[in-house]
């Protein structure tokens, strides 16, 4: 079982993004004139792990509660440890390794 730990740790070296956030990004891009993602965004998106497990999404949300209380922000369903927020197209920015959208904006 000890040999499985490095592989498990490696899987957490990727950023995460929720299925819902990907859908929001695609809706926003679809409303643009050309409806295409740029090459940099496609590269970043393929470097992230899409999560759809509600337990993982809840863990991402709960890990950000202390920041939420201080900044008037809420998580965008994406981490930004290694790759910047793709959800910037929907108004999100990286703060403490999680992408947030200011609820006051």
UniProtKB/Swiss-Prot annotation:
- Recount the PTM note: This is a cyclic peptide.
Which residues are trimmed away as propeptide when the chain matures? 10-71, 103-105
Which residue numbers mark the cross-link Cyclopeptide (Gly-Asn) in this sequence?
72-102
Q: Which residues form the signal peptide?
A: 1-9
Which GO BP terms apply? defense response
Which terms are listed as keywords in the entry? Disulfide bond, Knottin, Plant defense, Signal
What InterPro entries does this protein's entry cite?
Answer: Cyclotide, Cyclotide_bracelet_CS, Cyclotide_sf
The answer to whether the entry has keyword GTP-binding is no
The intrachain disulfides are 76-92, 80-94, 85-99
User: Does the keyword Ribosomal protein feature in the UniProt annotation?
Assistant: no
Domain of life according to the entry: Eukaryota
Read off the SUPFAM superfamilies from this record: Cyclotides
Spell out the family assignment given in the record's similarity comment.
Answer: Belongs to the cyclotide family. Bracelet subfamily.
As for what it does, the entry says: Probably participates in a plant defense mechanism.
Please quote what the entry notes about the protein's domains: The presence of a 'disulfide through disulfide knot' structurally defines this protein as a knottin.
What protein name is recorded for this chain? Cyclotide vibi-J
Q: Which organism is it from?
A: Viola biflora (Yellow wood violet)
């Amino acid at each position: 079982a000890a040999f499985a730990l490095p592989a498990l740790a490696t899987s957490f070296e990727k950023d995460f993004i929720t299925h819902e956030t990907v859908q929001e990004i695609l809706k926003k891009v679809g409303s643009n004139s050309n409806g295409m993602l740029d090459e940099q965004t496609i590269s970043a998106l393929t470097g992230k792990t899409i999560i759809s497990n509600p337990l993982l999404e809840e863990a991402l949300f709960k890990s950000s509660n202390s920041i939420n209380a201080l900044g008037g922000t809420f998580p965008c369903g994406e981490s930004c440890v290694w790759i910047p927020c793709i959800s910037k197209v929907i108004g999100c920015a990286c703060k403490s390794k999680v992408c947030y959208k200011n609820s006051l904006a």
